[in-house]
């Protein structure tokens, strides 16, 4: 009798527990395949926190990571051929035109927006970057824009070098506002022995990503922006008739500036740098300047990666004293002496679910987990994650940054530089139309020719324009123009 009673009790207990187990493991037996870039930046969090989500839900997560140069071809080939091999895509928002515009990803459901606290994401990212044709197809994972890093212990009016600098260049040594000033400071310090964390060693002027098939084209755009972005006019890559602007005198001057600074003031082997190198060289105290997304900031406070803790200054990228007005065919002196046009380069990494995924429910739940407000804050203040500030709460909560190791002054400086970039009325949003990858690949090739001396900047950019026109014609000029205007918010 006791045995029979025990069997009944165990059976009832099993029935009682089974729904709980099923509820706690809602995606048991389901596999979610994620595709993104290799390395600690972006790919690292996708894998680490994907494993946490899998343990909590019973699902299996496979994160496939590819070199950045290979990522777009891998994704677009899988989508266009209908292999169904990827469920979640973590990709450059520049590619939205091909990916969302091609109908390859699912709209973001309201429950996902609610779960990630959608309204906390800055309007730029939730309304423009995540949208295609009036529909939200992605969740912003990272807020990207370019910024300038500099050694504030060396570059300031009270610096030990200030008097010598002013005697040579005629202005007070301080955070540069123009590319001319940036070059003069870099030139002044190039090869000079300076003290960094108690060690005296020669320093380079600049560390920038110049390697072909990496991110060089985005850093050319930083320079071209000041010289060619007309205040109040949204057109930058193409004009209102889809004629490429990238070989006009403003763009040519930007490329010439880059050639000049490479020849005078570059860190050793900078021609082979991508952003990973910049994120090592500047925090190591080996350059006066660095250009990057927001990633360098948290690295500068990491005692395991940085010797410039408290010595790094953060600023909006420089502008130009004059800009080329393509509508009149003339140079214009900038109002106030500087035409600043900060660049929302890349626009950030976004997350979408493939329309042909057969595990949509699990895939969107993974997106919720990876894009949550609390995790976003943790990732933004952690060096090496590739995730930069994109939420209002991250700008409002200074304790988030001081708790991570920033001193209060540096935290404010860092956040102010990012916010000033995003909020600038003359800021440029990156190219997002179909073919963006191809357009940029052609520009990348032109930059390499100019930097190595194979062609002068004008000739190199003329060749780029010829290729851009061919891409536009192949994709359909009228349709490309319509989509380009839509991306700019122009009717």
Where are these regions (language model features)?
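Extracytoplasmic/periplasmic substrate-binding proteins
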Residues: 49, 216-233, 252-365
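Extracytoplasmic "Venus flytrap"/periplasmic binding protein-like
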Residues: 33, 48-124, 128-131, 135-138, ...
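Short, low-complexity disordered leader/linker segments with a strong preference
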Residues: 1-33, 55, 60, 462, ...
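Short, solvent-exposed loop/beta-turn-alpha elements that line the ligand-binding surface or hinge
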Residues: 109-121, 163-174, 210, 227-253, ...
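C-terminal lobe and pocket-closing loops
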Residues: 296-307, 320-445, 480-485, 491
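Helix-loop-helix "hinge/cap" segment bordering the ligand-binding cleft or interdomain interface
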Residues: 55, 112-116, 130-218, 230-272, ...
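Extracytoplasmic "Venus flytrap"
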Residues: 26-48, 66-69, 144, 434
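Hinge/lid segment of periplasmic solute-binding proteins
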Residues: 24-26, 93-149, 156, 198-200, ...
């Amino acid at each position: 009798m006791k045995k029979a009673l025990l069997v009944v009790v165990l059976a009832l207990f099993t029935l009682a527990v089974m729904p709980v187990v099923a509820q706690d493991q809602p995606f048991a037996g389901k596999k979610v395949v994620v595709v993104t870039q290799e390395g600690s930046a972006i790919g690292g969090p996708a894998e680490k926190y994907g494993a946490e989500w899998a343990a909590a839900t019973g699902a299996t997560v496979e994160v496939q990571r590819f070199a950045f140069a290979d990522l777009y071809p891998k994704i677009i080939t899988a989508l266009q051929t209908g292999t169904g091999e990827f469920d979640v895509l973590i990709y450059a928002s520049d590619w939205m035109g091909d990916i969302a515009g091609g109908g390859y990803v699912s709209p973001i459901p309201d429950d996902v927006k609610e779960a990630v606290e959608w309204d906390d994401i800055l309007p730029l990212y939730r309304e423009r970057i995540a949208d295609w044709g009036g529909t939200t197809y992605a969740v912003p994972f990272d807020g990207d824009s370019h910024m300038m890093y500099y050694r504030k212990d060396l570059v300031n009016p009270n610096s030990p070098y200030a008097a010598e600098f002013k005697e040579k260049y005629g202005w007070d040594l301080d955070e540069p506002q123009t590319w001319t000033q940036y070059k003069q400071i870099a030139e002044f310090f190039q090869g000079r022995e300076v003290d960094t964390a108690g060690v005296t060693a020669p320093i380079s002027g600049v560390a920038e990503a110049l390697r072909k098939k990496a991110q060089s084209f985005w850093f050319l755009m930083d320079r071209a922006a000041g010289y060619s972005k007309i205040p109040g006019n949204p057109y930058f890559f193409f004009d209102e008739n889809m004629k490429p602007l990238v070989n006009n005198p403003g763009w040519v001057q930007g490329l010439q500036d880059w050639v000049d600074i490479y020849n005078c003031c570059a860190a050793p082997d900078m021609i082979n740098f991508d952003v990973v190198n910049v994120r090592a060289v500047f925090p190591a105290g080996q350059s006066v300047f660095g250009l990057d997304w927001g990633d360098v900031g948290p690295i500068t406070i990491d005692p395991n990666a940085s010797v410039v803790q408290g010595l790094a200054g953060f600023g909006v990228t420089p502008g130009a004293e004059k800009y080329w007005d393509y509508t009149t065919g003339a140079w214009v002196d900038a109002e106030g002496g500087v035409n600043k046009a900060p660049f929302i380069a890349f626009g950030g990494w976004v997350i979408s679910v493939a329309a042909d995924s057969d595990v949509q429910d699990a895939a969107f739940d993974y997106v919720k987990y990876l894009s949550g407000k609390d995790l976003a804050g943790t990732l933004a203040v952690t060096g090496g994650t590739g995730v930069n500030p994109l939420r209002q709460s991250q700008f409002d909560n200074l304790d988030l940054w001081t708790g991570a190791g920033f001193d209060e002054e540096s935290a404010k400086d860092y956040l102010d530089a990012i916010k000033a970039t995003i909020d600038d009325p003359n800021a440029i949003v990156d190219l997002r139309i179909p073919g963006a990858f191809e357009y940029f690949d052609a520009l990348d090739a032109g930059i390499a020719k100019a930097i190595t001396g194979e062609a002068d900047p004008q000739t190199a950019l003329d060749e780029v324009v010829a290729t851009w026109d061919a891409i536009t014609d192949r994709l359909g000029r009228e349709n490309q123009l319509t989509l380009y205007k839509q991306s700019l918010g122009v009717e």
